[in-house]
């Protein structure tokens, strides 16, 4: 502890070099924290969905395939099913914003039974059921867009050739890890609009867009099961029922369904870990070069220290501690700073519904800090060994 002032003064001896080393460390770690947090959040959302006992049915050929709306009623009648709802992605524009938030066409009667972690006031839910053009939005979406009950919410069709002129009838809330930026509107209203486009295109003699011909498509079916142990058998039963139909299905748990999106991006886990390793290697070179230059400038000073009685071990300790101090400051700014930044700045509204929330957990922040300390230790080890074993005579020759 008595050498801390000396170590601190050495770290400040070349302020430009120290600041650049700290800045490079903090920026690299800040970006690495974002990548690790993104992977952790995707995994966390998938794992937390286990407790809700839900399975998801989609077309066996992927999202491009159709799931007839009639399947929802048939699945609802199966043993072990609490409720089922269509969950059809709309993907419209709001005030010319492309993909501003997630939008789904659902069954007003069952959606909040299936998604029972979401809560909405009974009178608002009743208004949603009674008004065909009504919608229920998340509390965070209402806050972001300054929407309230009775406000219009026009969505311009992008994937579909129809516009949804909605009215906010309810605002739902939910757990901290739930998506509270969704817009849920009635499937029957959406389907009727698609049918009108199909009919008008056919009567006019023109070819209707492919999406307009897909009225009656549930997209996916979210199914609430009574217990978790029946989910595998129930999923198999659903798939067996439609195996030989024109629209075979694939049913999986909500956890597997959520992880499927990450799998669509490729081997995301390996890519993120590879980038993280590259960041660590780059930091080793940056910090190592900075410490090597610092030790070359202090050859005479190290020789004087050893001449007045400083042991090799003490010289080694002083150099290593300086390297760890510089890297640790960069790590604190980058890793802990990212934690504080994303705790106060919510970037989820700018992800178009892809991420319901974003934060850097303490585990990831501490991991980043540990990485910076390792970088400091590893980058300072070689210069410290050279300094500890340097010749006093050769060092003092440079004294003028």
Each model region followed by its residue ranges:
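Peri-transmembrane interface segments
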Residues: 38, 42-45, 222, 227-284, ...
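A short beta-strand structural signal in non-transmembrane regions
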Residues: 55-61, 141-142, 205-241, 249-250
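Hydrophobic secondary-structure segments that place a key small or acidic residue at a functional site
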Residues: 87-88, 97-107, 118-203
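Transmembrane alpha-helical interface segments in multi-pass membrane proteins
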Residues: 279, 292-346, 367, 371, ...
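Hydrophobic alpha-helical transmembrane segments of multi-pass inner-membrane transport and secretion
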Residues: 15-42, 262-301, 324-331, 375-378
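Hydrophobic, regular-secondary-structure patches
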Residues: 26-104, 109-110, 120-131, 143-144, ...
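N-terminal Sec/SRP start-transfer signal
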Residues: 1-32, 44, 48, 320, ...
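Conserved transmembrane alpha-helices of multi-pass membrane proteins
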Residues: 337, 350-382, 394-400
């Amino acid at each position: 502890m008595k050498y801390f002032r000396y170590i601190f003064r050495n770290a400040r001896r070349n302020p430009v070099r120290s600041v650049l080393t700290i800045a490079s460390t903090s920026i690299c770690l800040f970006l690495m924290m974002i990548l690790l947090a993104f992977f952790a959040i995707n995994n966390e959302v998938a794992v937390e969905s286990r407790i809700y006992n839900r399975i998801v049915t989609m077309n066996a050929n992927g999202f491009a395939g159709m799931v007839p709306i009639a399947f929802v009623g048939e699945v609802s009648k199966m043993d072990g099913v609490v409720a089922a709802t269509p969950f059809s992605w709309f993907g419209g524009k709001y005030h010319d914003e492309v993909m501003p938030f997630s939008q789904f066409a659902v069954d007003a009667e069952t959606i909040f039974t299936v998604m029972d972690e979401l809560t909405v006031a009974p009178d608002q839910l009743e208004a949603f059921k009674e008004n065909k053009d009504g919608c229920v939005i998340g509390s965070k979406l209402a806050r972001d867009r300054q929407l309230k009950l009775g406000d219009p919410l026009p969505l311009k069709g992008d994937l579909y050739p129809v516009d949804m002129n909605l009215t906010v009838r309810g605002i739902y809330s939910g757990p901290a890890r739930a998506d509270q930026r969704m817009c849920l509107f009635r499937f029957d209203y959406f389907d009727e609009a698609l049918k009108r486009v199909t009919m008008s295109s056919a009567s006019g003699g023109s070819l209707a867009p492919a999406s307009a011909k897909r009225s009656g498509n549930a997209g996916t079916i979210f199914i609430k099961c009574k217990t978790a142990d029946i989910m595998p058998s129930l999923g198999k039963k659903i798939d067996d029922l439609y195996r030989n139909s024109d629209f075979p299905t694939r049913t999986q748990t909500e956890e597997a369904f959520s992880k499927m999106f990450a799998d669509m991006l490729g081997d995301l886990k390996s890519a993120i870990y590879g980038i993280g390793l590259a960041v660590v290697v780059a930091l080793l070179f940056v910090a190592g070069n900075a410490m090597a230059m610092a030790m070359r400038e202090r050859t005479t000073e190290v020789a004087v220290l050893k001449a007045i009685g400083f042991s090799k071990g003490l010289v080694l300790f002083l150099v290593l501690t300086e390297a760890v101090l510089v890297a640790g400051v960069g790590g604190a700014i980058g890793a802990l700073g990212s934690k504080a930044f994303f705790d106060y700045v919510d970037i989820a509204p700018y992800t178009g519904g892809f991420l319901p929330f974003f934060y850097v957990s303490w585990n990831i922040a501490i991991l980043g800090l540990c990485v910076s300390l390792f970088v400091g230790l590893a980058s300072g080890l070689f210069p410290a060994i050279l300094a500890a074993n340097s010749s006093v005579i050769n060092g003092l020759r440079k004294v003028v």
